Amino acid sequence: TDLDGTLFKGETLIDGVREAILELRENNIEIYFTTNNSSQSPSEIREKLVSLLNLEIDINKIITPLIIFKDQISKKLNSIYIYGSDELKKYIETLNVKIVNLSISDAILIGRKEINNEIEIKDIISQVQNGKQIFCLNKDLTYPTEYGEQPGNGAVVKIIEDELSINIQSLGKSGEMYPSYFKINNIT
C-alpha cells in the first residue's frame, strides 16, 4: 500500500487505516508499505508508521526509492553528490558511499529539499552537461501534507530535464527500477 495521502497526510493517520491493516493481518495478507518519499530513511518511515498506527512494522516491508538505490545503484559508486535533506545524506552514508563535492562526485542523486537552491541546480545542470551521471529518487511534482500539496523533488528534476532535454532515471514508482525490484525479490 502507498503511504503519503493513502495511509496518512503529514502526521495525521487517515480514518479507518489502522482497522484495515489489522483486518488484513488477521487474514494473513502480507502488507508492503511503498512510498516515493525522498527525504526520510526507511527507518524514519518505520518509526512514523509505528507511532501513527500503534502497531509493529517490519522494516523489510518498507519499500522506498532509497531501497532501490541501496539494492541496485550504491555498490556501483564510490562517491555521490546529494541534492536533498540531511536525513537523506545520513542514510546514504550508511551504505558506504562517500558523499562529496559536486565537482568530484561519480554521480548526482536528486532528492527533496525543503528550500530549493537555484545556484546549486545550475551547478548540477553544468555537471550533467559535462557528462556526470544523474539519478533522482522520484519525479513527483508535489507531495501531500495535512496543509495541502507541497512542491516535490520532481520540480527540480523537471528543471534539469527541460534545460538539458534529457530523461533522468528515476528510482521511484514511475521509473523502471522500482517495479523490477519487486520482480527480482518475488514480491507480489
Task: Please give the residue ranges for each predicted region.
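Short acidic low-complexity segments
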Residues: N96-D106
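Asp-based phosphoryl-transfer active-site loop
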Residues: T1-G16, A20, F33-T34
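Conserved Lys-Pro-Asp/Glu-containing loop-to-beta segment of HAD-superfamily phosphomonoesterases
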Residues: K76, Q169-T188
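Substrate-recognition/cap helix-loop segment adjacent to the acidic, metal-dependent catalytic center
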Residues: P42-K61, N130, E146-E161
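A short, structured active-site edge motif that brings together acidic residues
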Residues: D58-I68, S103-S105, K139
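Substrate-recognition element of Asp-dependent hydrolases with the DxDx(T/V) motif
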Residues: V17, I21-K48, I62, S79-G84, ...
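Glycine/Thr-rich beta-alpha phosphate-binding loop at enzyme active sites
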Residues: L137-S174
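Short, charged N-terminal beta->alpha structural module
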Residues: D71, K75-N96
